[in-house]
Amino acid sequence: MQKGIKFRIYPNREQKNFIHQTLRCCRFIYNRGLAMRKEGYENGEKIGYSQTSAMLTELKKQEEFAVLKAADSIALQQSLRDLDRGFVNFFQKRASYPTFKSKHNRFQSYRTVNQKDNIRIVGRYIKLPKLGFVKIRQSMEVEKINHVIIEHTPAGKYFAVLNVDFEPEPRSNAGGTIGIDVGIKAFYSDSNGNTVSNPRYLERSMRKLIREQRRLSRKQKDSHNREKQRIRVAGVYEKVTNQRNDFLQKQSTMLV
């Protein structure tokens, strides 16, 4: 089995510039491939991954698109594979028609694949294609990395989501059942008489988020102070999301 492990990374200024350049290139290639496939779909012409990949190769030969040659080539190919997967899901009625990616989306990411051990953790750093060694806050050991998703969040933080193989630990099945009643005052009560309260730290974070959102609404539009406040709101929102997910994960694990 595979799982994703998320670590925060701390790229330097040069590495940040490269990450954002790769994000722009991946978005451009994805949108270019989508436009190509959309036109072919409307004209009854079958265009798949191989045709969009050939389009990328031709663009790299043109001086106008020289920036594509400097970006992570694996990440560019992966963006086209994501597009192809989107069309497969659409035709199998598992998803809606793929849409163009906007540069105004605050959350951006790209995926790169481990080839010939070009992605690995060495000490307090992770080696990434074209980026070199990037400082990482590693909270657990990992073995072979299959691929990595580099994320830039609305709060201005950078993360590396590592896809790794793992063997799940077998769990004993007691064979029992339990009833759960989700409430408002308490998070839930079960049929054994146990009650789990809503976490107070999450309530405090929610109140802080509301305060910061009110401050944001009072800032002048397009001002520097508004952008600073937007990042502050995004940071609090990210904290609330992480706290909620951590709480739910712990409760579900305890019940199982």
Model-derived regions, located:
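Nucleic-acid substrate recognition interfaces
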Residues: M1-V256
